[in-house]
């Protein structure tokens, strides 16, 4: 069958890919039969046959959707093949997890990515998996993690948005996506993802700290201050936001304002070591400036 994939007479024929998918389906069924009978079976063969079957049946469906010479679409494959893919999808998760745990992240990514992408296969459109599959955000997060392990920034950017609603991994997926944009040199997308991260995950300091640091280091202190004020309006006792506002005043040499906000940060967290250290530094700098005035 492999030769038929490249043969000019057969490679664009839906039957070719249907047969290829059926072969993988039979491999899968044979291994699962052994498992049911408590005989030795190859778990990776089960998982890889599920992956290949999905790939081949999707290609079959794509070709079968092309109109014939009369302009009509007669896709006899869709119903049975979509049912087979739906039944196989859980093994895409299992295969991805097994390869991920073996630190074979390139292979893991293929499984997780296929699971996520299958939710938008036209042949499964009636199932509305993007809305109904409650595991989708979690598996998109796994795909993002595997992509990060292999350094595939484009894959991170592709799968992370679907992971943002995952309860446990959403904020980290957002962080990886921001890092990926930064690594690719797309500053506009990086800044946008940091801003989105602040709004989606206000309890995560990463996004706010990186955004303020960017504004501050690029001589946009007023933008940083504006953002700090906006965040404090929503959470006036947040120690990080108070500290950042103090730090901005500190850099602007507005020492009295800096002292005020460092003290507010300390009031919010009496063990905030950085705030104690910096308020002491500001007092010292203020004293030095005053001594220079009197010389």
Descriptions of predicted regions:
Residues 11-13, 122, 170, 204, ...:
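Residue-level recognition of tetratricopeptide repeat
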Residues 26-35, 123, 185, 251-253, ...:
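Short coil/turn linking the two alpha-helices of tandem helical-hairpin repeats
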């Amino acid at each position: 069958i492999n030769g038929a994939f490249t043969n000019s007479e057969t490679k664009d024929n839906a039957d070719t890919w249907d047969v290829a998918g059926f072969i993988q389906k039979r491999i899968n069924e044979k291994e699962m039969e052994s498992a049911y009978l408590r005989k030795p079976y190859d778990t990776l063969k089960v998982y890889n046959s599920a992956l290949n079957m999905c790939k081949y049946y999707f290609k079959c469906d794509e070709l079968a959707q092309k109109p014939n010479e009369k302009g009509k679409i007669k896709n006899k494959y869709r119903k049975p093949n979509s049912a087979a893919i739906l039944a196989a999808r859980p093994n895409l998760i299992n295969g991805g997890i097994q390869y991920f745990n073996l630190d074979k992240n390139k292979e893991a990514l293929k499984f997780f990515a296929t699971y996520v992408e299958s939710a938008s296969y036209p042949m499964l459109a009636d199932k509305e998996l993007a809305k109904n599959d409650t595991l989708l955000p979690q598996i998109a997060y796994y795909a993002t993690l595997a992509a990060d392990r292999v350094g595939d920034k484009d894959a991170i950017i592709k799968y992370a948005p679907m992971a943002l609603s995952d309860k446990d991994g959403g904020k980290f997926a957002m962080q990886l996506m921001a890092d990926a944009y930064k690594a690719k040199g797309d500053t506009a997308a990086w800044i946008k993802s940091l801003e989105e991260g602040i709004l989606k995950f206000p309890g995560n300091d990463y996004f706010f700290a990186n955004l303020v640091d960017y504004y501050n280091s690029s001589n946009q202190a007023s933008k940083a201050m504006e953002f700090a004020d906006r965040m404090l309006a929503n959470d006036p006792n947040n120690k990080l936001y108070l500290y950042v506002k103090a730090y901005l005043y500190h850099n602007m040499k507005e020492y009295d304002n800096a002292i005020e906000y460092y003290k507010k940060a300390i009031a919010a967290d009496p063990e905030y070591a950085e705030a104690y250290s910096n308020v002491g530094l500001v007092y010292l700098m203020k004293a030095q400036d005053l001594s220079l005035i009197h010389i």
